[in-house]
Amino acid sequence: MVNKYTYTSSKAMSDISDVIGEPLAAWDSQVGGRVFNVIFDGKVYTNTYWVERWQVPGIGSSDGNPHNAWKFVRAATADEINKIGNPTTADVKPTENIPSPILVEDKYTEETYSRPDVNFKEDGSQGNLSYTATRVCAPMYNHYVGDKTKPKLSAYITDWCQYDARLDGGGSKEEERGRGFDLATLMQNPATYDRLIFSFLGICGDIGNKSKKVQEVWDGWNAQAPSLGLPQIGKGHIVPLDPYGDLGTARNVGLPPESADTSIESGTFLPYYQQNRAAGLLGGLRELQKKAHAMGHKLDLAFSIGGWSLSSYFSALAENPDERRVFVASVVDFFVRFPMFSCVDIDWEYPGGGGDEGNISSDKDGENYVLLIKELRSALDSRFGYSNRKEISIACSGVKAKLKKSNIDQLVANGLDNIYLMSYDFFGTIWADYIGHHTNLYSPKDPGEQELFDLSAEAAIDYLHNELGIPMEKIHLGYANYGRSAVGGDLTTRQYTKNGPALGTMENGAPEFFDIVKNYMDAEHSLSMGKNGFVLMTDTNADADFLFSEAKGHFISLDTPRTVKQKGEYAAKNKLGGVFSWSGDQDCGLLANAAREGLGYVADSNQETIDMGPLYNPGKEIYLKSISEIKSK
């Protein structure tokens, strides 16, 4: 039995219940996730989300956070008061000093906050980058009863997430401060996800900002190959970007220290580039999959090629028949080396342009993409057959204009299995003209002619399914384990300071979820709410959440447990293939739990770390005007 973080309530909002709503009653400290209708002081109230026994109708909080779930409906009639009652006073208090098992003190993070070159304050009043490590949150992963009929939960896992030199006495330099995510936290519940996607492999020929690293590994491969009886490789071949982190280390990858091999680097890695000899993140994923299978859970593994920083050569590769053959053969080779993988994920950002600066692009990218997928499908089927079939997935933009250049309907017709819709980064500081939601499911009610400023996941899904005819079960809806922030935000005009110091964890404008939970959003005291001067708010125009602090106009668009659960419910209702996150190493389990519950999975009461029910509340309601509405004035 897990020591469960128990709230003051006794029934989870997510629990299955036959009771949809209660008949009108006198207020009497009702508690739970059901819909209650009560009379208090001559008025009728209903709860809009989880309600605690100590929340008194009509009494709000002083800081603007929605601590009180009761919403005024109407005046009670004299007949109702006579028959039901009319309490007018209350003498209840919240449980005080609730234990705080989500947050954990991490001395390295605290020391970093106080460094003169960092000078971070949790209210956003000083330095904007926190360099918060994942260690500030305890693992909060619940166990859920398996159900093969429900949509799947996936997550990308990055091969740089494990690093944090502060664990070894470093941290004086910015590049030494890392996330320090430990894969061992998932070892405690290997059934958290249905698929994990190892990210990223690079492509020989890369010309982007990672080109030197790609070239180093490429040269190292070719230097080792002759002595191992292997052919040398050329442009188009996929390579690991971090041989030591992928194959050699035991730190933060769920492996015992003795399994590490510090000699592994670009010039020595090739003998270890296989499933049975790998340590590093690849070895950790191997062991995680074994643990999942041992407990009866099928954990699929995929490997992703490209991503934002490694997509520079896709266009040239896809256009060249010889390099396509090299690429396809190298993907087959990776599957042979690592048979634990069942899927290859192509993350080309983006066909037709719009990716990182310096990326090659062409008007023919869409048609060449089809050739690449077609040839890859043919080679995989020829080598592995049906019984050991390997899937092909892509990560694609959530922006309709970019989707149109990817020829996705033809990709599906030529063998594409899954589409991971990157329904995040709709907003971001510097590139966005206005503050907005970065990972919202729904568009504003009337986006009008300015819809490019108010994007949404649903609009992208509508294009894929209704315009291109993509089957819903091939689409996986993305949620973000990080926020997008701005400073100097004005909620009326949606203006912000474009080049200002926006709050972030490791980079400007990108606070990660564990950092958000530590510094800006309270998830520990019965409800999701803001803290340290931040207010959790819900835009009723798009049904999306954000955090806002008036002190400096700090704005953080984010997915909360409520919005992630909402995405899971949408996926289940519309029979999508599932939901996924970028990235699993930015979450402590709260958002993964919310996704599971939204998809319809039921928590195992004997292995439930946290009751998620109270965390599904909306924030303080506000109506953010669409850009069309603002411009029409």
From Swiss-Prot:
The active site is at 349 (proton donor). Disruption phenotype: Cells with a disrupted yenA1-yenA2-chi2-yenB-yenC1-yenC2 locus are no longer pathogenic in C.zealandica larvae. Residues 151-602 form the GH18 domain. It is an enzyme of class 3 (hydrolase). It comes from the Bacteria. It is found in: Secreted. Its EC number is 3.2.1.14. GO terms for molecular function: chitin binding; endochitinase activity. Chitin binds at residues 275-276, 306-309, 350, 422-425, 582. One of its GO terms (cellular component) is extracellular region. Toxin complex is secreted when grown at 25 degrees Celsius or less; at higher temperatures the proteins are present intracellularly but not secreted. Its main location: secreted. Keywords: Carbohydrate metabolism, Chitin degradation, Glycosidase, Hydrolase, Polysaccharide degradation, Secreted, Virulence. Coiled coil: none annotated. GO terms for biological process: chitin catabolic process; polysaccharide catabolic process. Optimum pH is 5.0, in the intact toxin complex optimum pH is pH 4.0 to pH 8.0. It catalyses: Random endo-hydrolysis of N-acetyl-beta-D-glucosaminide (1->4)-beta-linkages in chitin and chitodextrins. Belongs to the glycosyl hydrolase 18 family. Part of an orally active toxin complex (TC) with strong insecticidal effects on larvae of the Coleoptera Costelytra zealandica, Acrossidius tasmania and Adoryphorus couloni and some Lepidoptera larvae. The TC has an endochitinase activity. This subunit might aid infection by degradation of the larval peritrophic membrane. Semipurified toxin complex consists of at least YenA1-YenA2-YenB-YenC1-YenC2-Chi1-Chi2. The Yen-TC:K9 subcomplex is about 26 nm tall and 22 nm in diameter with 5-fold symmetry and 5 copies of YenA1, YenA2, Chi1 and Chi2; the chitinase subunits may be solvent accessible on the exterior the complex. The Yen-TC:K9 subcomplex has no insecticidal activity. The native complex with additional YenB, YenC1 and YenC2 subunits is 16 nm taller and is insecticidal; the toxicity-conferring subunits are present at about 1 copy each. This is Chitinase 2. It comes from Yersinia entomophaga. The lineage of its organism: Bacteria, Pseudomonadati, Pseudomonadota, Gammaproteobacteria, Enterobacterales.
